[in-house]
């Protein structure tokens, strides 16, 4: 692994600054980082972390409280463009995998130590193979398994809210 460090974001101003940068990026989900929307979500985050390499923020994401003792890890994951995996660059010039190597293990340990059940999700059925691969690559001690169905993680009228779920238990209240 590269020499990266996870740091907690404790101030809303720093978080919103990162969201503003992400919302202006070419990230496919840039609209998900809208500052006004993220400001409204701030109080539902139990922890927000960033991945740092030197002075550079590589990525950020949070642990979002879904209620009923359930949290979503790597919520609103943002990865800087040069660190994103691209199907055109299978050789991967940048071997840093923020979700797999850092955020999912760190945030899951943080949440399970506090008694929460965890999940993470990926949109659309066509990304199920990627979700299966990611779940297999995680350390077994984290306890993740890919659940058999698609689940509504937000407004079911929005097709992007129906997602593949990997969770630390088989039955989650979604």
Region spans (language model):
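Short amphipathic alpha-helix that is part of the acyltransferase structural core
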Residues: 1-33
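Short glycine-aromatic motifs
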Residues: 4, 19, 44-46, 135-146
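Residue-level preference for hydrophobic side chains embedded in well-ordered alpha helices
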Residues: 15-18, 74, 99, 103
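A conserved beta-strand-loop-helix scaffold within acyl/acetyltransferase catalytic domains
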Residues: 20-81
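Conserved acetyl-CoA-binding loop-helix of GNAT-fold acetyltransferases
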Residues: 85-111
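Conserved GNAT acetyl-CoA-binding A-motif
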Residues: 109-125
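Conserved beta-strand-loop-alpha-helix junction that forms the acyl-donor binding cleft
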Residues: 120-136, 154
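C-terminal "cap" of GNAT-fold acetyltransferases
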Residues: 142-174
């Amino acid at each position: 692994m590269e020499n990266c460090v996870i740091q907690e974001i404790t101030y809303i101003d720093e978080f919103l600054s990162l969201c503003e940068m992400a919302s202006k990026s070419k990230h496919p989900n840039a609209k998900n980082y809208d500052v006004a929307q993220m400001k409204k979500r701030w109080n539902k985050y139990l922890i927000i972390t960033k991945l740092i390499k030197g002075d550079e923020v590589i990525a950020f994401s949070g642990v979002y409280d879904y209620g009923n003792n359930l949290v979503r890890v790597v919520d609103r994951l943002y990865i800087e463009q040069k660190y994103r995996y691209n199907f055109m660059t299978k050789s991967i010039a940048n071997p840093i995998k923020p979700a797999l190597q850092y955020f999912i293990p760190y945030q899951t340990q943080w949440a399970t130590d506090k008694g929460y059940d965890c999940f993470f999700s990926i949109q659309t059925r066509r990304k199920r193979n990627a979700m299966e691969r990611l779940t297999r690559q995680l350390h077994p001690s984290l306890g993740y398994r890919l659940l058999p169905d698609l689940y509504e993680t937000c407004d079911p009228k929005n097709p992007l809210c129906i997602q593949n779920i990997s969770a630390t238990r088989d039955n989650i209240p979604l």
